[in-house]
């Protein structure tokens, strides 16, 4: 009997401001790919819907409130050589609050060319290259 594949569902957000800049955060020390920049997001908990997981993660990480209905599915990328995950990227242009690095992470607003010049996590680099901006 074949084994059931094991992979971790992850959600991330390409949040764009009125100037067309993307919000990215830097992975904190002690985490996988520490120091690399990424789209904010995180793991989907068992039984949790992806949009709800993303709203929760954005609130926990950045203190922002996002309406799940304002999230648009954009791209999917799958496992890299070092991780068996499937990452679902959503886009949004509306939120409430001011970003704060609630987990000690650095964050910033970047144009797509500025973002491409950052040391990005591998899956995030793939997503950025394919994101229609």
Show which residues each predicted segment covers.
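Conserved N-terminal beta-strand and adjoining loop/helix that marks the start
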Residues: 1-22, 43, 74
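Residues at secondary-structure transition points
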Residues: 4, 31, 41, 45-49, ...
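Active-site-adjacent beta-strand/loop module that shapes the phosphate/pyrophosphate-binding cleft
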Residues: 8, 17, 75-98, 106-108
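Conserved Nudix-box catalytic region and its N-terminal flanking loop in Nudix hydrolases
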Residues: 21-61
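A short coil-to-beta-strand element that immediately follows conserved catalytic motifs
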Residues: 65-75
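NUDIX/MutT-family hydrolases
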Residues: 89-91, 99-131
């Amino acid at each position: 009997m074949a084994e059931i594949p094991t992979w971790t569902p992850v959600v991330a957000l390409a949040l764009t401001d009125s100037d067309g800049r993307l919000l990215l955060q830097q992975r904190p020390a002690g985490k996988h790919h520490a120091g690399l920049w990424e789209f904010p997001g995180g793991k989907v908990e068992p039984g949790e819907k992806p949009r709800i997981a993303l709203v929760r993660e954005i609130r926990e990480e950045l203190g922002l409130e996002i309406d799940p209905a304002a999230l648009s599915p954009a791209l999917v990328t799958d496992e890299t050589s070092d991780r068996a995950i499937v990452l679902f990227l959503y886009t949004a242009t509306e939120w409430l609050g001011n970003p704060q690095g609630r987990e000690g992470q650095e964050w910033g607003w970047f144009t797509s060319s500025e973002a491409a010049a950052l040391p990005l996590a591998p899956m995030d680099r793939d997503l950025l290259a394919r994101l229609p901006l």
